[in-house]
Amino acid sequence: MPEQRLRIAIQKKGRLSEDTVKLLKACGVKVNLNTQRLIAHSDNMAIDILRVRDDDIPGLIMDGVVDLGFIGQNVLEEENMMRTVAKEPTAHKVVKELAFGACRFSIAVDQDFDYQGAKSLANLRIATTYVHILKRFMEEQNIPYTSCMLTGSVEVAPRAGLADAICDLVSTGATLEANGLKEVEVIYRSTAVLIQRADPLNQQKQDLVNRLLTRIDGVQSAKECKYIMLHAPTANLEAIKSLLPGSEQPTVMQLSGSSDHVALHVVSKENLFWETMEQLKTLGASSILVLPIEKMME
């Protein structure tokens, strides 16, 4: 029955969309998203994927139209503030912070601008898509300004004479530099999150959500971990174990045909640097392998 299928909203295009699709596939959700269809159905789970504009996702969650949504915190925060002003529903639950979509929301000015702190922004005209987040910051700083609402290409506003400064998302800063701007004030930091509608789901849907969250945990944990395998002389076993970074107690196995060497296997949440590998080698370790982990369940 359609009402028993979990409805998940994702951004229809862009980097966040690509990362979300990769995550869903890594979680074992089989769905064909290669076509331009706005709704896609999973082949192996009771899940429907709705591809929509990113700024529509919070509203779909808050209005109870969909069950889950993958969204940037910046978009969620802006929509939440806008709906609060309009006295529209804002209830939702953030159920998982995700390991992608990290960016910052910053004010940028012309590279020649003599910036002496936030007070230098007084009485400037600032172009932005996120008027409410900007407004909150400027009011907290007690700085008068004029807002210029733009829905795209915010970075060209100063050159076009539309604004004195901008407030926009920044990942690397390359776009700002290309447009003769410099970042002067970070006012908000964002990452991707998974949000859920506030009203309770039926048991079948909630069970599916719980399964999905467990798989997301497994995928994200696996990305942060490495599987380390090596052969070690028993005479230096404790010294070698002490060099393995951030690990639980390793699995130690006797090597076939050898009484003075063992195999060590361990999952590490820290990188094994070349210097450490060289130290291990000095202690007699051999066949040292550091492997990525695709999936993990603790």
From Swiss-Prot:
- GO terms of molecular function: ATP binding; ATP phosphoribosyltransferase activity; magnesium ion binding
Q: By what means is the activity of this protein regulated?
A: Feedback inhibited by histidine.
Q: What class of enzyme is it?
A: transferase
- The primary site where this protein sits is cytoplasm
Q: Which GO terms describe its biological process?
A: L-histidine biosynthetic process
EC number(s) per entry: 2.4.2.17
Q: Which SUPFAM superfamilies match?
A: GlnB-like, Periplasmic binding protein-like II
**What is the protein's known function?**
Catalyzes the condensation of ATP and 5-phosphoribose 1-diphosphate to form N'-(5'-phosphoribosyl)-ATP (PR-ATP). Has a crucial role in the pathway because the rate of histidine biosynthesis seems to be controlled primarily by regulation of HisG enzymatic activity.
Question: What family is this?
Answer: Belongs to the ATP phosphoribosyltransferase family. Long subfamily.
Kindly provide the name given to this protein in its UniProt entry: ATP phosphoribosyltransferase
